[in-house]
């Protein structure tokens, strides 16, 4: 099918999902430099928070270099055209965090739950709509639910007031057919005016292919990150996605050369390590494990002598989901004892 002339809103993840490989320690200067570069390149929507969303600063998830208020307060006044979004996970972020973000000028709030737990989003979605925000329901780890199951969860979020629903491949585990199956079912079930989004990870190198597959079945919001900066092997690399969309005639409004320069000149030099598909990131995608578990597993591996790959496979076998970061160390300790590495 031809996608020529199809309009898509590209949503940047560099400054939120990209906080995971940065251990949430981006400086305000880095944040504002990248945000202004993205704005100048024509990116219409930029997410800014702790990697785990508003209120994510904690022992469990990691302490950031600055508060959410400081990051948002630094970026929002500098935006000429782009709007700023924030992620919120119920149980981590609160309604008070939501109101704070709105007061600072956040345009879009994305309320994220595990793909079987949309019912915990009601309070936050209802409040966001009451505050007249662009309100997104964000269903994480979508490979862990069937198309029919995702439809039920999406319709719940829509009933609470979400005007856009995201199907989110947090583990980078889905292949294009799995993306199409899930998103086409959700698209058919939602009201025509409710938007549909897709968030991909590149652990199996499928970020761009999956995003195009999502667009083919009706997604009109697509997440990506400059130079792919994000959890695991990163998000869908934005500069590649924009180039592919340009070749296909999909209209994003983002300048290919400018977004490539942002990736190459601003994001790559800031990386603490290359964002690539190493054996552990590949394991995330292969075993279907939550992307931000990667660094936790690497740290546990260094501490207890169990290969990170083995820890990740075990987490996948146990069906661990986002929010269970504290279980990674427990799992590593158990495995180390079983292998005689700990007394």
From Swiss-Prot:
GO terms for biological process: catabolic process; L-leucine biosynthetic process. GO terms for molecular function: 2-isopropylmalate synthase activity; 4-hydroxy-2-oxovalerate aldolase activity; manganese ion binding. Belongs to the 4-hydroxy-2-oxovalerate aldolase family. Gene3D superfamilies: 1.10.8.60, Aldolase class I. It catalyses: (S)-4-hydroxy-2-oxopentanoate = acetaldehyde + pyruvate. Mn(2+) binds at residues 17, 199, 201. Its EC number is 4.1.3.39. PROSITE patterns: PYR_CT. The active site is at residue 20. InterPro entries: 2-IPM_HCS-like, 4OH_2_O-val_aldolase, Aldolase_TIM, DmpG_comm, DRE_TIM_HOA, PYR_CT. It comes from the Bacteria. PANTHER family: 2-ISOPROPYLMALATE SYNTHASE 1, CHLOROPLASTIC-RELATED, HOMOCITRATE SYNTHASE-RELATED. Residues 8-260 form the Pyruvate carboxyltransferase domain. The record marks 16 as: Transition state stabilizer. Substrate binds at residues 16-17, 170, 199, 290. Pfam families: DmpG_comm (PF07836), HMGL-like (PF00682). Keywords: Aromatic hydrocarbons catabolism, Lyase, Manganese, Metal-binding. This is 4-hydroxy-2-oxovalerate aldolase 4.
């Amino acid at each position: 099918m031809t996608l020529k002339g199809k309009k898509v809103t590209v949503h940047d993840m560099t400054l939120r999902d990209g906080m995971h490989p940065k251990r949430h320690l981006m400086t305000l200067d880095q944040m504002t430099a990248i945000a202004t570069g993205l704005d100048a390149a024509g990116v219409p929507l930029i997410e800014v928070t702790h990697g785990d969303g508003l209120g994510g600063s904690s022992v469990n998830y990691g302490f950031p270099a600055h508060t959410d208020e400081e990051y948002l307060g630094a970026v929002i006044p500098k935006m000429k055209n782009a709007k700023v979004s924030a992620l919120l996970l119920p149980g981590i972020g609160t309604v008070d965090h939501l109101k704070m973000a709105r007061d600072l000028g956040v345009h879009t709030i994305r309320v994220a739950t595990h793909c079987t737990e949309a019912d915990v989003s009601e309070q936050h979605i209802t409040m966001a709509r009451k505050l007249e925000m662009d309100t997104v329901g964000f269903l994480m780890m979508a490979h862990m639910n069937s198309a029919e199951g995702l439809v039920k969860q999406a319709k719940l979020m829509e009933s609470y007031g979400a005007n856009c629903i995201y199907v989110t491949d947090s583990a980078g585990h889905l292949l294009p057919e799995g993306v199409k199956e899930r998103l086409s079912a959700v698209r058919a079930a939602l009201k025509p005016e409710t938007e549909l989004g897709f968030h991909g990870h590149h652990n199996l190198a499928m970020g761009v292919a999956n995003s195009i597959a999502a667009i083919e079945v009706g997604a009109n919001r697509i997440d990506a990150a400059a130079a792919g900066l994000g959890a695991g092997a990163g998000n869908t690399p934005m500069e590649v996605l924009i180039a592919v969309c340009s070749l296909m005639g999909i209209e994003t409004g983002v300048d290919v050369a400018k977004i490539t320069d942002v990736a190459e000149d601003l994001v790559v030099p800031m990386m603490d390590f290359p964002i690539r598909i190493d054996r552990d990131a590949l394991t995330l995608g292969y075993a279907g494990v939550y992307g931000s578990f990667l660094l936790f597993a690497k740290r546990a591996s260094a501490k207890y002598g169990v290969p990170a790959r083995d820890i990740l496979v075990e987490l996948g076998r146990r069906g661990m989901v986002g929010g269970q970061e504290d279980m990674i160390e427990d799992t590593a300790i158990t495995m180390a004892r079983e292998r005689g590495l700990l007394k």
